C-alpha cells in the first residue's frame, strides 16, 4: 500500500479551500449550456483515449503496490484497468453527453383557479462529494454525470487507486478547459490522509450538498454514521434470485450462472439462490450442476444437502454475507411466500430477481419485495445505470429519500417551483 501523501499540514484548511472552489464552480455550471457541457464531455472522452497508455502505466503502478497483499480478487478486479475498460470508460462519457440535459426540464405544470401558472423544474443539487475505493473508473463516471447534471464534484479516491485516478482526472480537467468551463468543477482531493474523508463528511463548511460513497462495507457504514449531509448509498449488495416451479429451467440455468459468475465482485452479483420447494425434483439439481461446472462454490441449506450431500452446509452467517467471489448460498423455500419471507429477512434491499412463467408469482414478487431494483426473467447483473440507459451511474442507492436504484443524471438534480402571475394578491 502507498504511504500517506500529505500536501498540507492543515487538512481542514485544504479541504475547505477545495469546497469553496467547488461551490464557486457550481454556480456557473447551474446555467451552463447543454452544448458547452457536451463539448466538455466529448473532449474528456477524447483525452482519455489519447492518454490511455499513460493511464495504463499509472494503473500498473497502483497494481504493483498491492502485489502480495491479502486483497480479494474482487478488489483487484475493480482496481484493474485495460484497453477495453478504458474504451468503455470513454464510451460511457459519450453516452452521458448523448443524454437529454435534465437541468431546466419542466417535470410538472398546472394552472390554479386564481390564474397562477406553476411549474416544477429540475435544478442541480450543487456540490457532490464522492468517496471511493479501488475504482479508478469512478473518477470518469462521477465527474461526467455530475457535470451533465450541472453539479460540481469533489472526488476522494483511496490510496490504492491514486495514480490511476490522477491520470484520469487530468483528462477530465482537459475537457473542462476545452469547453471553457470552470476547472474546479471536477476536483480530486490531492491527499490520501483519512482526515480528508472526515472533513468531507462534515460538509466542508456548508459546501457539500450530497455525499456518495463507493466502496466496501466499512467505508459506507462510516459515511452513513458520520455524514452531516445527505448520503446516496447502499451498504452492500445481498442480491437474491428466486426460481419458481413455473420457471423455464434452461432460462433459469443461464440467468443464474450469469447473475453469479459474470463478474463476482460487483454489487449486482447474486449471492443467494432460492429454489421453490415444488421444483426440487426438476430444477434444483440442474441449477447446482451448472453452477458447479462454472466453478462456483455452493453452500446449501439442509433441504439442499439432502439432494446434494457433498456440498458445504450453509450457516446463518452465509445468508448475510456479500461474498463478492465465486460462492453462492442456496436454499429451498416454500414457494413465492417462502422466497419473499427469506428476502425480507436477509436482503440489503439492493436487487432481487424472480424467474417464473406464472404471472401471479411475478406480480406478487414485484408488489411485496421492497428492494430498489426488481427483475423478472433477467440477471441481477443488469443492476447498473449504464444498462438502464443512464449512460453510467454514480452509485446505487437503497434508501427511500430522493434517489433510489441507479443514481444517474436525473437523480443528481433537485427541483424548484416557478410561479407566474399577473398581479395576483392573496386574500
Swiss-Prot record:
It is found in: Cytoplasm. Keywords: Amino-acid biosynthesis, Cytoplasm, NADP, Oxidoreductase, Proline biosynthesis. Pathway: Amino-acid biosynthesis; L-proline biosynthesis; L-glutamate 5-semialdehyde from L-glutamate: step 2/2. Its EC number is 1.2.1.41. It holds the Pfam family Aldedh. One of its GO terms (biological process) is L-proline biosynthetic process. It is an enzyme of class 1 (oxidoreductase). Its main location: cytoplasm. GO terms for molecular function: glutamate-5-semialdehyde dehydrogenase activity; NADP binding. One of its GO terms (cellular component) is cytoplasm. It catalyses: L-glutamate 5-semialdehyde + phosphate + NADP(+) = L-glutamyl 5-phosphate + NADPH + H(+). NCBIfam families: PRK00197.1, proA. Catalyzes the NADPH-dependent reduction of L-glutamate 5-phosphate into L-glutamate 5-semialdehyde and phosphate. The product spontaneously undergoes cyclization to form 1-pyrroline-5-carboxylate. Belongs to the gamma-glutamyl phosphate reductase family. This is Gamma-glutamyl phosphate reductase. The lineage of its organism: Bacteria, Pseudomonadati, Pseudomonadota, Alphaproteobacteria, Hyphomicrobiales. The gene is proA.
Amino acid at each position: 500500500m502507498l504511504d500517506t501523501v500529505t500536501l498540507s499540514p492543515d487538512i481542514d484548511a485544504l479541504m475547505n479551500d477545495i469546497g469553496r472552489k467547488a461551490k464557486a464552480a457550481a454556480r456557473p455550471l447551474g446555467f451552463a449550456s447543454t452544448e458547452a457541457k457536451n463539448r466538455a464531455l466529448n473532449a474528456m472522452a477524447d483525452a482519455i483515449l489519447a492518454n490511455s497508455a499513460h493511464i495504463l502505466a499509472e494503473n500498473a503502478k497502483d497494481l504493483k503496490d498491492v502485489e502480495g497483499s491479502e486483497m480479494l480478487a474482487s478488489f483487484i478486479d475493480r482496481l484493474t484497468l485495460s484497453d477495453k475498460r478504458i474504451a468503455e470508460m470513454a464510451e460511457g462519457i459519450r453516452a452521458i453527453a448523448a443524454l437529454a440535459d435534465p437541468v431546466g426540464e419542466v417535470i410538472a405544470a398546472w394552472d390554479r383557479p386564481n390564474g397562477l401558472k406553476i411549474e416544477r423544474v429540475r435544478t442541480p443539487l450543487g456540490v457532490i462529494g464522492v468517496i471511493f475505493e479501488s475504482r479508478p473508473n469512478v473518477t470518469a463516471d462521477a465527474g461526467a454525470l455530475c457535470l451533465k447534471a450541472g453539479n460540481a464534484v469533489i472526488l476522494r479516491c483511496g490510496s490504492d487507486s491514486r495514480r490511476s485516478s490522477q491520470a484520469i482526472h487530468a483528462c477530465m480537467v482537459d475537457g473542462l478547459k476545452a469547453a471553457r468551463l470552470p476547472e474546479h468543477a471536477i476536483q480530486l482531493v490531492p491527499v490520501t490522509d483519512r482526515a480528508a474523508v472526515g472533513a468531507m463528511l462534515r460538509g466542508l463548511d456548508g459546501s457539500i450538498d450530497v455525499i456518495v460513497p463507493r466502496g466496501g462495507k466499512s467505508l459506507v457504514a462510516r459515511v452513513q454514521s458520520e455524514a452531516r449531509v445527505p448520503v446516496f448509498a447502499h451498504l452492500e449488495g445481498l442480491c437474491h434470485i428466486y426460481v419458481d416451479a413455473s420457471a423455464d429451467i434452461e432460462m433459469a440455468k443461464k440467468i443464474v450462472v450469469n447473475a453469479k459468475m459474470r463478474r463476482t465482485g460487483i454489487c449486482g452479483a447474486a449471492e443467494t439462490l432460492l429454489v421453490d420447494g415444488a421444483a426440487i425434483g426438476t430444477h434444483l439439481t440442474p441449477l447446482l450442476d451448472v453452477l458447479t461446472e462454472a466453478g462456483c462454490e455452493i453452500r446449501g441449506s439442509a433441504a439442499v444437502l439432502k439432494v446434494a450431500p457433498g456440498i458445504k452446509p450453509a450457516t446463518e452467517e452465509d445468508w448475510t454475507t456479500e461474498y463478492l467471489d465465486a460462492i453462492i448460498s442456496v436454499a429451498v423455500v416454500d414457494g413465492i411466500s417462502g422466497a419473499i419471507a427469506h428476502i425480507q429477512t436477509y436482503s440489503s434491499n439492493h436487487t432481487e430477481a424472480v424467474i417464473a412463467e406464472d404471472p401471479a408469482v411475478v406480480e406478487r414478487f414485484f408488489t411485496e419485495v421492497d428492494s430498489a431494483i426488481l427483475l423478472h426473467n433477467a440477471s441481477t447483473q443488469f443492476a447498473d445505470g449504464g444498462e438502464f440507459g443512464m449512460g453510467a451511474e454514480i452509485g446505487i442507492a437503497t434508501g427511500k429519500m430522493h434517489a433510489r436504484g441507479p443514481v444517474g443524471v436525473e437523480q443528481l438534480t433537485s427541483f424548484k417551483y416557478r410561479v407566474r402571475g399577473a398581479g395576483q394578491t392573496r386574500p
